[in-house]
Amino acid sequence: MSNDKDSFNVSDLTAALKDEDRAGLVNALKNKLQNLAGQRSDVLENLTPNVRKRVDALRDIQSQHDELEAKFREERAILEAKYQTLYQPLYVKRYEIVNGTTEVELAPEDDTKVDQGEEKTAEEKGVPSFWLTALKNNDVISEEVTERDEGALKYLKDIKWCKIEEPKGFKLEFFFDTNPYFKNTVLTKSYHMIDEDEPLLEKAMGTEIDWYPGKCLTQKILKKKPKKGSKNTKPITKLEDCESFFNFFSPPEVPDEDEDIDEERAEDLQNLMEQDYDIGSTIREKIIPRAVSWFTGEAMEAEDFEIDDDEEDDIDEDEDEEDEEDEEDDDDEDEEESKTKKKPSIGNKKGGRSQIVGEGKQDERPPECKQQ
């Protein structure tokens, strides 16, 4: 076990993350690298010359691997940018259909069905509640959407994302139609990453929502009756924060560097930041690319199928382990039973042992197979 000096100090890194200019983070990482360098030199010095030569060869191979990986990341970024450009016309078509600016022509057989009995609704354009339904069908997002939120999310026209180059990260954009809840037409959420290839979040920033009076969904009004005999007969009103999807645009705030926070609060803050990033990455990686599949529920069924497969594999492994344990228990019971029935004599070890094994196998049965 390494000593405390050489071990990675999470609190140091957390403290460093509080500094917006990242100077503290750089120092923390430098200290960590220095510790690692010291450990590495100790390991190398303890090697024999022949082993040291082999390790040096392995390090050369690792360097070649790192060069290829850097090239892979560079080419991947170019490829991703290329396909993001190719996706855009498809997203535009999706937007037009969802919001009714483009009408899809019915196939002849579908048109006949409408003429035979179904009424055409002139007012209904596009696909109502498209994004609301897509968001609610995802397990991660649905936990954030309350019944009060649904009225506002019905006005959601589109969701887009784009990369941020400086600082590295990505931005989500939520486009809303004119609605009775807030004045904003676009709500944004930006994630600034310390390392784009690793999910190491520096901070998140969201749009301040300009709510109409009495329409704020992130707060609720509590009314309390005045005490008996009080001169003030009017109910006492109080605003209280409440759960809402729109809290997503007010991400957790990291305390100032000089502010002391206890371990429990720091852990709660870390959990909130991880949850917030999970929501953002889910919208970016799952909802936006496959919105119609989430709307229809097909994406949800596909995820459930994958989860079921994983659970079935876990069950099979557990049952295999249980079967092995049952076999071991049966063997132990048979051995104890045989010893009780007849003990081998010292003068006839071979014959005695053979007899015990034979008696043990007479009543032995294979363990039941719980699942084929």
Curated annotation (Swiss-Prot):
Note: Triple mutant nap1;1-nap1;2-nap1;3 has no obvious visible phenotype but exhibits hypersensitivity to DNA damage after UV-radiation, affected transcription of NER related genes, slight hypersensitive response to abscisic acid (ABA) in seedling growth and impaired somatic homologous recombination.
Organism of this sequence: Arabidopsis thaliana
Physiological role: May modulate chromatin structure by regulation of nucleosome assembly/disassembly. Contributes to the regulation of cell proliferation and cell expansion. May function in nucleotide excision repair (NER). Involved in somatic homologous recombination.
Protein name: Nucleosome assembly protein 1;1
Residues covered by region (Disordered): 299-372
Residue ranges of the motif Nuclear localization signal: 223-228
SUBUNIT field: Can form homomeric and heteromeric protein complexes with NAP1;2, NAP1;3 and NAP1;4. Binds histone H2A. Interacts with PP438/PNM1.
Disrupted gene: phenotype observed: No visible phenotype. Enlarged plants early in the development but reduced plants in size in a later stage.
